[in-house]
């Protein structure tokens, strides 16, 4: 297998295998159909166009298919794109499998679970601790495998758990600076805030939105589950409502998906930590293939901005 799409520079020829993450049909200005393919390998993703595609191409080059491509890395409107020279479906003779093309979190699921469990052990409020532990255990397998999103940030295998671990570590540092923060609430809110995504999303590979995800969303899903968990465990009190509020308000604004803004201190900080970690992941991913003195591709979720890597920073990759 080749060195990976992340390691190629604009103008370089390449020949490699890719997993098709999505295939979208459209019609060009000349009236001919084409496919926009999002291709991935173990290092990253890239867009490619398959011009003048036939009905057979549409049936062959679908989401989840593994293909062999020869082409050249190019740039279009500030974004890298793979110019396809030839493309074919793979066969058993190629000896490739889907797991070869999936990017994963830099920490193992066991390591992440151990870290998260330690934060739960540190909780002093038994009601908050029990509800958090119960919900995590209920969804543990999916939680450790799922991405945090379909696009934008932590959209890789185990991305959801990695997002939570990073947020918890930020929260611990902030709590040391601001001792008025209730770490039980903050840690529980971080662990639970995106847990509804195990029902909102379809799985760790070829991730799409489920019917529940489209009609309810991860916030509503988890708010309901917190209530059900409290009933199941026989827990009453304000802790239940506060945990629900933490999940409900973590997007901060109605136009961002939260029906209520943060109205307690820990909910506001939870939103900020979530935003920091998501944006850091987006910027880090965009700057991975950028050399010092260059700008990244535009990041749609960050006002379509490009980010600059200062000249005095070390190159990110050994491209030899």
From Swiss-Prot:
The identity of this protein, by name, is: 3'-5' exoribonuclease YhaM
Keyword Hydrolase on entry = yes
| HD domain boundaries | 163-279
- What UniProt keywords are attached to this protein's entry? DNA-binding, Exonuclease, Hydrolase, Nuclease
DNA-binding region of this protein: 18-90
Q: Which InterPro entries match?
A: 3'-5'_exoribonuclease_YhaM, HD/PDEase_dom, HD_domain, NA-bd_OB-fold, NA-bd_OB_tRNA, YhaM_exoribonuc/phosphodiest
Taxon lineage? Bacteria, Bacillati, Bacillota, Bacilli, Bacillales
Q: What is its EC number?
A: 3.1.-.-
One GO MF term, please?
A: 3'-5'-RNA exonuclease activity
For the protein in the UniProt heading, the enzyme class is hydrolase
Matches recorded under SMART domains: HDc
Q: What job does the chain carry out?
A: Shows a 3'-5' exoribonuclease activity.
Single Gene Ontology BP annotation: rRNA 3'-end processing
Q: PROSITE patterns per the record?
A: HD
Q: Indicate whether Hydrolase appears among the record's keywords.
A: yes
């Amino acid at each position: 297998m080749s060195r990976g799409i992340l390691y190629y520079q604009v103008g370089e020829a390449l020949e490699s295998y890719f997993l098709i993450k999505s295939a979208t049909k459209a019609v060009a200005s000349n009236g001919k159909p084409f496919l926009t393919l999002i291709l991935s390998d173990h290092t990253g993703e890239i867009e490619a166009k398959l011009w003048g595609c036939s009905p057979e191409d549409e049936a062959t080059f679908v989401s989840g298919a593994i293909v062999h491509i020869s082409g050249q890395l190019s740039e279009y409107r500030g974004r890298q794109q793979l110019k396809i020279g030839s493309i074919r479906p793979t066969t058993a003779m190629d000896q490739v499998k889907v797991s070869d093309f999936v990017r994963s979190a830099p920490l193992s699921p066991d390591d992440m679970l151990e870290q998260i469990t330690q934060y739960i052990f540190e909780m002093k409020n038994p009601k908050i601790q029990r509800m958090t532990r119960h919900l995590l255990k209920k969804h543990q397998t999916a939680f450790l495998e799922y991405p945090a999103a379909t696009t934008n940030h932590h959209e890789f295998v185990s991305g959801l758990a990695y997002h939570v671990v990073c947020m918890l570590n930020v929260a611990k540092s902030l709590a040391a600076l601001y001792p008025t923060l209730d770490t039980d609430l903050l840690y529980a809110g971080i662990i639970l805030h995106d847990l509804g995504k195990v029902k909102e999303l379809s799985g760790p590979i070829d991730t799409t939105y489920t019917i529940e995800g489209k009609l309810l969303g991860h916030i509503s899903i988890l708010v309901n589950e917190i209530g059900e968990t409290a009933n199941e465990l026989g827990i009453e009190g304000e802790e239940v409502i506060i945990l629900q509020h933490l999940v409900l308000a973590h997007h901060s604004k109605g136009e961002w998906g939260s029906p209520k803004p943060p109205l307690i201190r820990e909910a506001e900080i939870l939103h900020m930590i979530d935003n920091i970690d998501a944006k850091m992941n987006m910027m880090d991913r965009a700057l991975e293939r950028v050399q010092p003195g260059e700008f990244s591709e535009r990041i749609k979720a960050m006002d379509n901005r490009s980010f600059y890597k200062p000249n005095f920073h070390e190159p990110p990759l050994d491209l030899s």
